[in-house]
A protein has these predicted regions:
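Conserved short histidine dyad/triad with adjacent acidic residue
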Residues: 32-37, 50-66, 104
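Short acidic-glycine-tyrosine-enriched beta hairpin
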Residues: 85-102
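A short, N-terminal "cap"/entry segment at the start of jelly-roll beta-barrel domains
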Residues: 1-46, 130-143
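Short beta-strand His + acidic residue motifs that chelate non-heme Fe in jelly-roll/DSBH
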Residues: 62, 82-83, 99, 106-113
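Short strand-connecting beta-turns/loops that link adjacent beta-strands
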Residues: 43, 68, 103, 114-115
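Double-stranded beta-helix
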Residues: 110-143
Length: 143
């Protein structure tokens, strides 16, 4: 393997190729999305990145907040609603969403349209992460 090939395998990922590893996250009737995790297996140590597609009428994940991780979302296609801090904010293609850590910013992305909602997720992966789910009074810990 050449140095260029090695660098490419450690630094570049594509979600637009047939061999991209898409997976489905589904918990009926609440959550459903299809996504490809891009940072896994790369040289990145503290970044998480994925492309997610949420079908019409579905939510990507539970309403939650992180104690350590920051997140950003770039809406690539479609429109929907960002549920954040008890408010419902419209989102559409071209919007960039910044979510700081902490209980002030519980968040959830909902597809409230009749077309798929596609977005890029970016996160700073913490060594120890606590995630809280206000709707269900659950807490998750990742190490």
């Amino acid at each position: 393997m050449s140095k260029a090939d090695d660098l490419r395998s450690q630094l570049i990922r594509s979600f637009a190729t047939p061999d991209a590893s898409w997976s489905t996250f589904k918990r009926e009737p609440h959550y459903e999305s299809e996504g490809v995790r891009l940072a896994r297996g790369t040289a990145a140590k503290k970044l998480g990145m994925s492309v997610d597609i949420v079908p019409p009428g579905k939510r990507a994940c539970p309403y939650h907040f992180h104690y350590a991780e920051e997140e950003a979302f770039i809406v690539l296609e479609g429109s929907g609603t960002l549920r954040v801090a008890g408010e419902m904010l419209p989102i559409t293609a071209g919007d960039v969403i910044f979510i700081p850590p902490g209980p002030e910013y519980p968040h959830q992305i909902l597809n409230t349209s009749d077309a798929p909602l596609k977005y890029l997720s970016l996160s700073v992966n913490a060594e120890l992460e606590i995630c809280e789910y206000p709707d269900s009074d659950k807490v998750g810990v990742a190490v």
